């Protein structure tokens, strides 16, 4: 079935949020899988790195001691600015480096239009 119908969008933050919420619900314990533990689960032993925009509205409120960044990121998502995988820059300053996003979206629109022309 896959990502096209599961709704996860291949976003690791969405998956992390779902993991925490499912455990909390399943065990009726809102203290299970705090954001710090969830973040460690998705980054443990990783040699890749990502930088998020801490000024993104989803990163607020920051809390009295400015300590809510991980909780905001895990439970609200965030705007990915930079991403490096195996030493290669995938995103820099919020711009994908490995593909032309506009062209990819245009190709997707054209493929969907072509598909529906054949069945409508």
Where would I find each of the regions flagged by the language model?
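Active-site microenvironment of metallo-dependent hydrolases
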Residues: 7, 17, 36, 43-120
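Active-site loop ensemble at the mouth of alpha/beta enzyme cores that anchors a bound cofactor
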Residues: 2-26, 32-35, 39-40
């Amino acid at each position: 079935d896959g990502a096209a119908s599961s709704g996860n969008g291949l976003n690791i933050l969405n998956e992390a949020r779902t993991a925490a919420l499912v455990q909390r619900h399943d065990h009726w314990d809102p203290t299970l899988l705090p954001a710090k533990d969830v973040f460690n689960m998705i980054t443990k032993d990783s040699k890749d790195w990502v930088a998020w925009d801490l000024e993104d509205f989803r990163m607020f409120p920051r809390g009295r001691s400015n300590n809510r960044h991980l909780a905001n990121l895990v439970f609200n998502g965030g705007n990915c600015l930079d991403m490096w995988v195996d030493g290669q820059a995938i995103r820099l300053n919020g711009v994908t480096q490995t593909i032309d996003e506009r062209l990819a979206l245009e190709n997707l629109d054209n493929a969907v239009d072509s598909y529906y022309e054949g069945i409508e």
